[in-house]
Amino acid sequence: MAQKDIGNKVPLHTLKKVEEVAAYYDEWALNNKYDKDMEAWNYTGPKETSETFNKYQKSKNIEIFDAGCGTGLVAVELKKMGYQNFYGADISQKLLDLAPQGLYKSLERIDLNKKLIYEDDKFDSVFCVGTFTFGHVKPDALDEFIRITKNNGLICFTINVGVYKDYGFDKKINNLIDDDKWKKLEFFKSNYLSSKDVNAWLGIYKVAK
């Protein structure tokens, strides 16, 4: 989640394999340390992204895919606003095990860099907060998010500024606009982990199929 390293044993940006990332987060989940750290570090990504999404989303009765959901921080914020139907996925089973019971309709251990198990147009909206960062999910995942999102649905995400250009997110986002796959509603820089001086680009895009 950090620009380079958030202080754990191994800098996240050095991890190359999916299973290494999964093991990193599994260890971080022990004794609920992940959630404790997020609270201590004033991690505002889930709240800010949810609030920005809520400005554009009218109906509360929608199905939301929470990609890289971790312990459920995004769904917790959305539930406060009246949303109820969440489907979560993450690479770390230990983080999934910490999600509040009953918060999600389903939870799946999934590598978001691969083709997703869901059918086309399955969800009304997709969230991916804190997952586009060093050693994690790559830009091509956006193609899958569009595939599983209904027309006019919203895709909401954060991208660590340290990987935005290096990983090619800038080109991917603009190519999807040029190809009429989605339209930009919001895109701005968020200081979403202020205590660690970590910034991210926060985007809200409407699917146009």
Please place each PLM-identified region on the residue numbering:
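Conserved class I S-adenosyl-L-methionine
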Residues: 2-56
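Conserved beta-strand signature within the Rossmann-like core of class I S-adenosyl-L-methionine
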Residues: 152-160
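Residues lining the SAM
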Residues: 127-132, 158
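A short acidic, Gly/Pro-enriched loop at the edge of an enzyme's catalytic core
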Residues: 116-126
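Core SAM-dependent methyltransferase catalytic element
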Residues: 193-209
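A short glycine-rich, Lys/Arg-flanked "PGG" loop and its adjoining helix->strand segment in the class I
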Residues: 140-151
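Conserved Class I S-adenosyl-L-methionine
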Residues: 167-188
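Class I SAM-dependent methyltransferase SAM/SAH-binding core
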Residues: 65-115
